[in-house]
Amino acid sequence: MTKSGEVVHQALQAFMPQEGGVYDSIVSNPPYFHNSLKNPDERRAQARHTDALPINVLFAHARRLLTPTGTLSIIVPTDNAELYLSEAYLHGFSLCRRCDVRTTPRKMPRRSLLAFALTHGHMVERQEAVLQAADGSRTPWYAALTADFYIR
């Protein structure tokens, strides 16, 4: 049986794959607050602010760790998405998928799910998703996405 996934609790900057291995996919919920008021809890501040993992460092290490056909998938605030798109381009990545997520149909998107590849020339798959219907219930998309996390 081959290994299909691995979770490592370590700073990306210090991570060295075993046997010079590279990965087909990297998924990250990177810190995304820039120059904003920090939480007094050091762990929360590290998880939320880019001081510990600047955007350029994320892309540089993703490039180092991905196969030539691998993808980097991240979730970021929609209002910061352009910053990530620009940085991705500077590191040789191109956007292959984008899903902008709204909490309700009437609100603007709050989060963007972005997938980048090192290969170029493909069409960008775009989608918009909504978490809650107007009545407050989970949308079918969100219910299907999170079904495995709920007790039945």
Named regions from a protein language model:
Residues M1-A14:
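Conserved SAM-binding strand-loop segment of SAM-dependent methyltransferases
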Residues K3, G21, F93:
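Structured loop/turn residues at beta-strand edges in well-structured enzyme cores
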Residues A14-G21:
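Short amphipathic alpha-helix with an adjacent loop that forms part of the alpha/beta core around
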Residues G21, P30-V57, H61:
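Mobile active-site "lid"/loop adjacent to the S-adenosyl-L-methionine
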Residues D24:
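Conserved acidic residues
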Residues V27:
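A conserved beta-strand element that flanks and buttresses the S-adenosyl-L-methionine
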Residues A52-P109, L113-L114:
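Conserved Class I SAM-dependent methyltransferase catalytic core
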Residues R106-R152:
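SAM/dcSAM-binding transferase cores
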